[in-house]
Amino acid sequence: MWIYLPALRKTRRIVSKEKSKSFMGSEFSNANMTAPGLEDFSYELKGEEDLNGYSCFMIESTPVSTDLEDEYGYARSVSWVDKDNYLVHKTLYYDFDGELFKTITNKEFKKLEEGEGKYMVTHMYASNHSNNRSSEMVMDKVAVTSTSKSYFTVAYLERE
């Protein structure tokens, strides 16, 4: 994963051992900014529950190895997954002592393509229960267009 920091005009690679670190000083981690590797976790259905009017599955995810626990920075998570469209509305993260340390709530989604069933979270909120801090991320403008692969290079991102 790479991140471009426009204020510094620098591109930085985020290696796997940095997934658990804070994303730009926020309560989100670098791992929270990407889709997780599905093979990195084992899954268990913990139940079904309504959440804010959405009928959801409660899915517990556990990293399949201690190396992956260290990489992601938590021992397990529980997510409320919408039964209709499989969007994740809320996730609780538990530390290595089994204590809840972070909650992420996905408040709004934008459908990216008609008929494709692809969505993007456009409003998310992270609450850190260990330090009582929170962060909110809102993406006001989201557009999906055809993009040349050349845009996804360090040289292109850092051009003047």
Write out the residue ranges for each language-model feature.
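N-terminal mature ectodomain segment of secretory-pathway/periplasmic proteins
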Residues: 1-5
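Gly/Pro-enriched, hydrophobic low-complexity segments
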Residues: 12-14, 19-36, 52-154
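A short, amphipathic edge element
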Residues: 33-46
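Short aromatic-centered micro-motifs
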Residues: 49
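Short, solvent-exposed mixed-charge patches
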Residues: 159-160
